[in-house]
From Swiss-Prot:
The lineage of its organism: Eukaryota, Metazoa, Ecdysozoa, Nematoda, Chromadorea. GO terms for cellular component: nucleus. PANTHER family: NUCLEAR HORMONE RECEPTOR FAMILY-RELATED, NUCLEAR HORMONE RECEPTOR FAMILY-RELATED-RELATED. Keywords: DNA-binding, Metal-binding, Nucleus, Receptor, Transcription, Transcription regulation, Zinc, Zinc-finger. The gene is nhr-51. It holds the Pfam family zf-C4. Orphan nuclear receptor. This is Nuclear hormone receptor family member nhr-51. It comes from Caenorhabditis elegans. CDD domains: NR_DBD_HNF4A.
Amino acid sequence: MNKNCLICHRKAAGQHYGVLSCFACKMFFHRMVVENLHYCCQKFNKCYEKFIILPKCKACRYQKCLEMGMQAFPRRVKSFEESMDLKIQRMLMNLSEMDEQRHWRMLNSYSIEDPSLGDVLVDSNVMKIMRKPSNQKVTAHEWAFLDVYSRISHFSNFEFMNNISFADRKLIFSFNCLRTGVFHGSMRTLREQRDCLLTPSGEDVYPDAVHNLFKDSPGLLNRTCCLLVSKLIELKVTNEEYQLLSLIFFCNPTISHNLSDFARNTLASHQIKYSSALFRHLQITNPGTAPVRFQELISLVHVINRVTNDMQHVSMMFQCMIPSFKFKQLVTDTFVDCGVVQKKSNVKILNEKPCADSSQDFIFHKNKFIH
């Protein structure tokens, strides 16, 4: 480079702090800024005006740097809170992308096979999946089957599930598939700006035979299709809140006394992780009301459990009254019979709110589930 430094007129080495300058002037400016140095000129701050010999006045040299346009661009160290927020942001983006892919595969897939929950957990490729023909009519029961399969595939992609035993995973999925399906279906209904649950293709979730069976108590069917949706509408639940809540509810460590200690501890640690992320997200989006909002969102589990219990009752009554109808085995294992694992499961946070530690993430100190 044949150009001269704009500060001292010696040979320039490049652009430093926004100004063509030499290394000496670069390091001088750097020290002045980093060490917060201050000097005074004894000659009226005019040492760098028409000089022949390079002046030794540091005050005027620094003033010349500023006049030529040097600006400090200090490297900003992210605070703990900022680093945590970025992690949560990336987590939410990843969860949303995974859920969108799951939903797309469910909408565009079809299968006539009939594996059990155990079959799918042993070999995820046991079921032959084909691309759904555009003219393929899908019944409500088939949608339930495809939804269950998509959820097993979806949650199996989480790394923490890989280390859990087959027996524990079977308990976890048999308990959670219907509940997560009800939650997602109601959230989908909210996004579609409707107030009553329908299948993805827009049909009634119950066939005429079920309506005839419950013609004297239509309120039960209406409750299963509308109660959770109305609550989501009331709370204006966002997609980010939904993504985290799904995992908080899925990672329930007390769904069964038959769960191993390892599985229970794994679920509990991840429930804390996603609960912490949700609370921090609410602190950003709902400053001042995050604790109240958090409790409102967590209380959705009671509505989900009530709707789930009602759906199980409808399914079992339908099976008893019309025994000739054959449920897909995957639906039976996770829908009709899932109540066998645990008939009642109500979530309650024991008088504790997430608390902030100056050096740790927001966590639950007592995050327990009571039956």
